[in-house]
Amino acid sequence: MSKTIAINAGSSSLKWQLYQMPEEAVLAQGIIERIGLKDSISTVKYDGKKEEQILDIHDHTEAVKILLNDLIHFGIIAAYDEITGVGHRVVAGGELFKESVVVNDKVLEQIEELSVLAPLHNPGAAAGIRAFRDILPDITSVCVFDTSFHTSMAKHTYLYPIPQKYYTDYKVRKYGAHGTSHKYVAQEAAKMLGRPLEELKLITAHIGNGVSITANYHGQSADTSMGFTPLAGPMMGTRSGDIDPAIIPYLIEQDPELKDAADVVNMLNKKSGLSGVSGISSDMRDIEAGLQEDNPDAVLAYNIFIDRIKKCIGQYFAVLNGADALVFTAGMGENAPLMRQDVIGGLTWFGMDIDPEKNVFGYRGDISTPESKVKVLVISTDEELCIARDVERLKNTK
């Protein structure tokens, strides 16, 4: 038996989950927020209890020390050496990492170099990796990349229709994201359907604050909606998703607050999507409350959101030449029945039909009717478990 920590580190946060392996039992989980800011918050959940502390945590190394000391303080572990592996979620692996890898100095350097592909994510992940290596130098650290699952895409799918020198010289191409989530829910869908994954054509819809949709052909990613960065695809919580790129120089010319391309991209990443259109929130619960109040901006934001998701799912029916099932996962995908109802309502031509008694908050499983030609599934994603499994698989290979 061993204990493995799955880590998702951001620029100012560190989310974690501790597993007993190979039993895959969750021993504890938590998050450290506001790293580098005043009044940092450390939350630990274990044995049905929740402990919260307000601290000043200056960097990721200090955050990791607090996390490990809390595990001992609350009796979850007796000593650091009970932890036998650490797994880190890394958003961008580019073309360098086609699968999960054991961390060494070169790998860490490459992750930092790939920050250009995920400037909001990779630097935080690198800081988390460095902190754990400093504090637990003898324990195996493994990186699990969001992009790895999508390296199976064909060249004609991942290349953009621009001069090829931009790919050969600068590696401009579609990379995708959320790969760990898409891989996990596809595996779970195969179990639920009682069929080998290698025989299935699935469309997996990861709909949270970030939104990505993937065409899964026989267990491999055939296409996915996120692109060179996670900004591409359908409308999201704070991200615009796909727009005409000519809008960027136009806005720089017209709006004095947008001084350069970086300003526009920041607006598209952080101030757009549901939040930007509605002026209310990036949270679907707040948008749905706005629908109840007939708030016109909430209605508009919701309608754009549904429209973009339907279009994306529809194109993947074409990519796969049909599908056996559509899988909803992540925060909104799992917990927004109205959104699922309205998305499926625009896809009935493909032979999908959902049971309103099953399409309710909290239900997991097959929500389609017996007559539905394409099954509609709601599956809880578990990226942390995928990370822990890869640590278990790789920890003796370094």
Curated annotation (Swiss-Prot):
Mg(2+). Can also accept Mn(2+). Pfam families: Acetate_kinase. Its EC number is 2.7.2.1. GO terms for cellular component: cytoplasm. GO terms for biological process: acetate metabolic process; acetyl-CoA biosynthetic process. It is found in: Cytoplasm. Its cofactor is Mg(2+); Mn(2+). It comes from the Bacteria. GO terms for molecular function: acetate kinase activity; ATP binding; magnesium ion binding. Substrate binds at R89. Mg(2+) binds at N8, E383. The active site is at D146. Keywords: ATP-binding, Cytoplasm, Kinase, Magnesium, Metal-binding, Nucleotide-binding, Transferase. Catalyzes the formation of acetyl phosphate from acetate and ATP. Can also catalyze the reverse reaction. Belongs to the acetokinase family. This is Acetate kinase. The lineage of its organism: Bacteria, Bacillati, Bacillota, Bacilli, Lactobacillales.
